[in-house]
């Protein structure tokens, strides 16, 4: 790594943050509009946490879509 990044600083997120981001993306993909109770059980999260994740993921998707649209 020193060969590629020697003298430069960079941010490497903790493993927990990466796992959380992957989990959140998976929850968003599995969501079908009617399966919140199933997601609560599967991921052992509260209803409010599931809805917060869905809200955040929806916002991320919109931003990605807008970026794609702007570069086309």
Curated annotation (Swiss-Prot):
The keyword 4Fe-4S does not apply. Keywords: DNA-binding, Transcription, Transcription regulation. Residues 35-55 bind DNA. One of its GO terms (molecular function) is DNA binding. The keyword Signal does not apply. SUPFAM superfamilies: Homeodomain-like (SSF46689). Gene3D superfamilies: Homeodomain-like. InterPro entries: c-mor_Regulatory_Protein, Homeodomain-like_sf, Mor_transcription_activator. Pfam families: Mor (PF08765). Disulfide bonds: none annotated. PANTHER family: MU-LIKE PROPHAGE FLUMU PROTEIN C. Required for transcription of the phage late genes. Belongs to the c/mor transcriptional regulatory family. This is Mu-like prophage FluMu protein C.
